Amino acid sequence: YKREQDSAAPRIRLTNGLAAPDMVQGPDGRFYLYYFMGGTKMISVAVCDEPAGKYEFYGYVKYSDGIAIGKKNEPFQFDPGIFMDDDGKLYLYTGFALAGNPILLDGSKPTEHGPMCFELDPSDMLTVLNGPSYIGVAGEKESIGTPYEGHSFLEASSMRKFNGTYYFIYSTMNSHELCYATSDSPVKGFQYGGILVSNGDVGLEGVPDVKHARCNTGNTHGSIIELNGKYFVFYHRH
């Protein structure tokens, strides 16, 4: 899939590539790739009959009036995480919390309340049924005095469900770590759970912070999967 297949793709390529895509299989058996196109403020979708095949542009996530999310002065739409629940409901999670980043924000405002959630119509995989709403994962300002302090939301939304519990995985303001929060609902009440992994060695004995790191640290995205009863974390290395 090439950026030029998206009609909204800016001509200038610098910082205007496809960022942090996520994919889900729809009720029709096809595979839907959700991504952020730099310079558009929207979440785009491509579709294919197989997960690793040739994707074609499909459309933009939009409200019922046809206006794309990101075009109604909402906080910045970024790093989409798409999740199909086992009851057939479809949820999109987005957000970016770093203030003062003119290259990425492009005039948009960062989220101050953590990630946003949209319930989408699974019949077309695009139309918003409910939202945006905030799920309880704290941004930097509102994290003060809470378990999220020091590990507030930055970006890289990802939702998983294991044994009836929802796990929201995200990259924190520290950038080098993935943390998680849990809830019994996909749309609210998430409580901080802890650090999944740092892509350096922060947190090991004698390494209290990045300044003392012996390994390279840098921005990380990722999530967790369960295979044959074992759980695995995948993330960025530098």
Predicted regions and their residues:
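Carbohydrate-active catalytic/glycan-binding domains of CAZyme proteins
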Residues: Y1-H238
